[in-house]
Amino acid sequence: MKNMNNQEKNTYVRQHILSALLELMHTQDFVSISIQALVDAAGVGRASFYRNFASKEDVLQQESVRLTNEWKTNFDHEHPDGTPGQDNLWLVSLLDFYKDHAEFYLALYHAGLSNIMLETLLGYFDRSPEIPNGLAYLNSAIGYMLYGWVHEWM
């Protein structure tokens, strides 16, 4: 880590903490995993943990957001606006995304943290006060419906 710049160090720390947390979640209940045990398993210091994350849940939330943003970027690149059947492609692509990352999302499910997936999914849909109520309700309904599908499917 000596020759890394700050961004590279943070990326290294974040990746090792995430990997260690997911590994610990295979053998321990999420609530019983201490920050000290996590940083020891990751081979990083507590200060490095708190420089990057507010909590263990934050580690998983940030990964969920990162994965979803990566999916969205790839989908938008492969299917620019106006692609015929884009709505159907979007749904299939999203369901495939969750299948491809089932190990991560199943870890959330088994830890009782499915709400992280739900929050990330709902964050994708505009439900802001600036849009008409009907559209906000529709976006919420679609988000919860997709969450239900994925939750049951896994």
What spans do the regions from the language model cover?
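Cytosolic nucleotide-binding catalytic cores of signal-transduction proteins
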Residues: 25-28, 127, 134, 149
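An amphipathic alpha-helical interaction segment
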Residues: 100, 137-152
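Amphipathic alpha-helical packing segments from all-alpha helical-bundle domains
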Residues: 89, 93, 109-144
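N-terminal intrinsically disordered/low-complexity leader segments
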Residues: 1-10
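An amphipathic alpha-helix adjacent to DNA-recognition modules
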Residues: 11-22, 26, 31-35, 40-43, ...
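Short functional hotspots where side chains directly engage DNA or cofactors
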Residues: 46
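Hydrophobic alpha-helical connector segments
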Residues: 76-103
